[in-house]
Amino acid sequence: MKIRILRDTETVRYAAEELKKYLYMMDSDIEAEICCEGDGEITLGLLSDLKLDNSDVKDAMVDDVVDVKIDSLSGYIAGSNERSILFGVYKYLKSAGCRWVRPGDEGEYIPKKDMSRHSFAYRKKADYPFRGQAIEGAVSFEHVRDTILWLPKVDMNLFQIEQIVPYNYMSRWYLHTANTKLPHDDIPYEDYVRYAAELELIVKKCGLQLHGLGHAALNEAFGIRYKAPYMTYDIPEDAKDALALVQGERKLFNGHPMQTHLCMSQKWVRDRVVNWLIDYMKEKPYIDFMHFWLADAINNQCECEDCKKKTPSDWYVEMLNEIDARLTEEKIDSKIIFIMYVDTLWPPIIEKLNNPSRFIMTTACGSGKGYSDKRREGGIPKWERNNYSIVGGLDMALTFIDGWKPIFDGPRFVYEYMFYTGHYADPGYMTFARKVAKDMKELRVTGFDGIMSDQTQRCYFPTGLPVSVFGEFLFDTSLDTEEYIDKYMQDSFGEGWREAKEYLEKISASFDPEAMKQNTDVTAQDTGCVDVNSKKAGIIGNEALGDIIATVPDTVDKFAPVIEKYITLSDKCHRESWRILKYHGIYCKGISDVYYALSRGDQKGALDIFWKFADKLSEIEMEIHPYFDLCLFHQRTKQVIAGK
């Protein structure tokens, strides 16, 4: 048979190659040929190429519409853009029983099937246009590569590679910073540069939205390249006058480039930043969305007399307009993502965006608390320079967004952290997965157009269920949660899936994920502004919860024979799922010991147990590293032990 592509581009050809590969894996009688001319049994193209309805496509850069009609290996797969054609390929394959339960080859379940008898008709516009991830945690090139290739298989359409070179995230893996057994030897910096470039190419091959920059790019124009928070940085002589004046000094705030603002009232400073950004974008015009953010941290705005003439948001918008004008001059169509965060939560008083269509808004408003359209009582508080003290949250973010609407009322998405360390609160992932499904269904009431998930690319321990739910429920909020969970577990574990599901339900229930949450979310940790009245008792001193957690080792031991029964299944995906579950039992027993000590109020004892457990995890990390981020586990667990 022939697969005809109407556009011979990298992404469309990749979609055709994926279709060819998996058709053959399902049905070895199908040896497809990819062609550009003549007739083909299956045709791949844009909606417009095939003269199909595209009336619901407002912006092909962000609107994903999939249209598939194939009857007995004859028909078409079409999309509003090239990545939507790839989505369509996977939709067709999934309709025939294929499933990608986690990244990597061992996460793909491809059944045998006579495809000549299979038919599928489907048309759907994604419910949210922004669905994806940003690099985070401790990750290797392979971890991120496999994630990017997996994203379109679960309906995600974007990936952000934060920083010029994501050294902070990738070096944690290559240095094995949290592993007490492996050597802490770095690789050459040039390798990180090469990895970043290769990852960008993979994002583009899949046709995904490529998001670039973010925090830490602000000082690049002055020769200050941020790598990691523990490093020391020299300030070039010509950069000193460009740094924000804080408490009478112009220096790196907390010694940290990512936390350092500039003196934005000085035009030469703004010009230098703008020129650097334009040069960067001329080198990489393929970046679809450039995130231009200011510094992280609080109480670090410039206090010089000229900067005090306008608010940080006014200076920010002035610079955004300057960047937009230069991009227009250079005929670069990339969108600009601006962030409503800390001081720029407050809308500008003087400045307006000259070209709102260039921009997308994002904001970080905490995670794990669900979504509603409630606003903060009392409205927008008064802004004071370097006296930031507000407690964030969704209600506060929506209140500020209302204030921004006269200036900008365009597309916006949430910068979320649910998979940063939140998944560690539920070792079974079952309660967590249902919470993610509920949140994705409720997001619409906020007016947000999707989610960028700042997360580790290694959160599939014990399953990829929550992340799969995240992607596929953002694409289609009408999915039934319980039906989805059952089908996922069946595809992941094969024979014995009901036993696996029942076991993981017990694990989730034993830990009570709601009580295991940290008292402060990531945004609160960054700003230090926490509502003490909202803190929960959690696990420390919670003897009733500790008594339940104490049953976990017995639950694990009783289930061990079931794992041994299914761990040799013939299908590689099913076999790997059961193997992961075996190592996950070691994890459940160890973390239950830590939490039991905390339930008795013994924080010192819990820390001692944690370090012994961390040694054990270090010994087995190479068996589970694609699925479990040991570095963020260290960070999260030590914070819980400390009562944070």
Residues covered by each model-derived region:
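Structured mid-domain segments that build the active-site/substrate or prosthetic-cofactor binding neighborhood
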Residues: V269, D279, P381-R498, E502
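Gly/Pro-rich turn-and-neighbor structural signature
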Residues: A197, M258-H261, S265-K405, E416
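Conserved, mostly hydrophobic/aromatic
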Residues: L23, N81, L151, V273, ...
